[in-house]
UniProtKB/Swiss-Prot annotation:
One of its GO terms (molecular function) is protein-macromolecule adaptor activity. This is Sperm acrosome membrane-associated protein 6. Glycans are attached at residue 243. The gene is SPACA6. The extracellular domain shows strong structural similarity with IZUMO1 but does not interact with the IZUMO1 receptor IZUMO1R/JUNO. It is found in: Cytoplasmic vesicle, Secretory vesicle, Acrosome membrane.
Length: 324
């Protein structure tokens, strides 16, 4: 609605420029219409008075000191109300047969005092960001502008030791709106230090203005980006280049050393390994093989062999005798 009101005021301001032939738009032309100003002059000098043009020129000339005024954008409605009250006061003076030569300069001085009492706009805080609280309204053109700063903030370098925690704070040094603020995070891996959005991928699990990486590994080397938005409109993009350096922690180093030791002694081809089955000669030749259990087995084997030989001899003897 504010944009529509401003758009409707522009043709009136252009018409005023053509009629009054002033070099620049003043606050008077931004917050009053041509018909309102013409009506006031008609009340002062009459509908078709030869002094009508003189009155119109005097009206704009009295407010020329406000042509380059800049105000806090949020104070527009306050200033608009003040100009509305001024037009009503001038109409009352005209109805009371007052003089426009006195009324217009007096009204302009009062308006200057009101403008000096308005809340000032915040100064632009470099180096980046869409800073709505620093938006200003320019009477020289009846338009507003924000700080001429890029949306992308410079890359911040963060260096951590491998295995430690890396933390990023998505905080800007200018005031943010209080409502509908969201934070989204992206990551460009491979050790890239970049602001090119085509290299980034979303990190859906990262929420809020604070992000932690723990423990930091070499795979985390790259650029992390945080986008601050208000109602889907970007306000700032912050970048953090994470450089992971140094050896891993001591505990991890010892674990890796143990793992490498196991790999060194582990068989390469487990399917080719056969269990050791020593022969009788190997058992007798290796004293360490003659354990009590092995000696017991040897005795059992000897007894079985002797019994088998006895049985075979007896069976042979019976067969031989039965043949005779």
């Amino acid at each position: 609605m504010a944009l529509l009101a401003l758009a409707s005021a522009v043709p009136s301001a252009l018409l005023a420029l053509a009629v009054f032939r002033v070099p620049a738009w003043a606050c008077l032309l931004c917050f009053t219409t041509y018909s309102e100003r013409l009506r006031i002059c008609q009340m002062f000098v009459g509908m078709r008075s030869p002094k009508l043009e003189e009155c119109e020129e005097a009206f704009t000339a009295a407010f020329q000191g406000l042509s380059d005024t800049e105000i806090n954008y949020d104070e527009r409605s306050h200033l608009h109300d003040t100009f509305t009250q001024m037009t009503h006061a001038l109409q009352e003076l005209a109805a009371a047969q007052g003089s426009f030569e006195v009324a217009f300069p007096d009204a302009a001085e009062k308006m200057k005092k009101v403008i000096t009492q308005l809340k000032e706009a915040q100064a632009c805080i470099p180096p980046c960001g869409l800073q709505e609280f620093a938006r200003r309204f320019l009477c020289s053109g009846c338009y507003s502008r924000v700080c001429d700063l890029p949306l992308d903030c410079p890359v911040q370098d963060v260096t951590v030791t491998r295995g430690d925690q890396a933390m990023f704070s998505c905080i800007v040094n200018f005031q943010l709106p209080k409502e509908e603020i969201t934070y989204s995070w992206k990551f460009a891996g491979g050790g890239l230090r970049t602001q090119d959005l085509s290299y980034f991928r979303d990190m859906p699990r990262a929420e809020g203005y604070l992000a932690r990486i723990r423990p930091a590994q070499l795979t985390h080397r790259g650029t992390f980006s945080c986008v601050i938005k208000q109602d889907q409109r970007p306000l700032a993009r912050l970048y953090f280049f994470l450089n992971v350096t140094g050896p891993p922690p001591r505990a991890e180093t010892e674990l890796q050393a143990s793992f490498r030791e196991v790999l060194r002694w582990a068989p390469r081809d487990a399917e080719l390994i056969e269990p050791w089955r020593p022969s009788l000669g190997e058992l007798l030749a290796r004293p360490e093989a003659l354990t009590p259990s092995n000696l017991f087995l040897l005795a059992v084997l000897g007894a079985l062999a002797s019994a088998s030989a006895t049985v075979l001899a007896w069976m042979f003897f019976r067969w031989y005798c039965s043949g005779n």
